[in-house]
C-alpha cells in the first residue's frame, strides 16, 4: 500500500484514537533506505471527480458551511488538525522528496474535472480557487500558512531528505 492509500484507509476505517504511531511510522518509512522515493499525502486522482481529497473526507459538507475564521465547528477543527498532522508526518519522513498536488496544501474544497464528453466539455471544475487561501476571513489560509511553514522548516535543514530516519519511541497504548 502506498502512503496516500494508507491515509485514506485510516480516515475511512479507523477512529482517531486507533491511529497507532507504530503503524503510521511503518507505512511512511517502509522502503529501501538506498532507494530515493517521492512521498505525498494524497494522489492527484483523489482530487478528480468521483473521489474525495483528504480534507473533504475529514470535514465533508461542513467545509461548505463552517470555514469562516470565527466559526468554531468540531468537524472542521478536527479535520484541519488531522490534515496538518498527515502532511507533516508524510513530509518529514521523506527519502528523496515531497510532492503536493495543486490546491491540496490549503484544503481546496472541490474536485477537479477536466473538460470531457461526460461533463459536456465544461471548464467549471477545471480550476483551483486560489482566492480561498488568500482570504484571511476563511480557515483555508491556516492550512496554507502551515504548509508554507512546514516547507520552510524542511528547507532549513541542509540535505533534509538524506537525514537518517530514527524511530525514537512510540506507544500504541
What are these regions (language model features)?
Residues 119-131:
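Short, helix-capping/interhelical loops that line the mouth of catalytic, cofactor-
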Residues 128-167:
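Aromatic- and carboxylate-lined catalytic core of secreted/periplasmic carbohydrate-active enzymes
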Residues 1-117, 123, 155-173:
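Conserved alpha/beta catalytic core and glycan-binding cleft of carbohydrate-active enzymes
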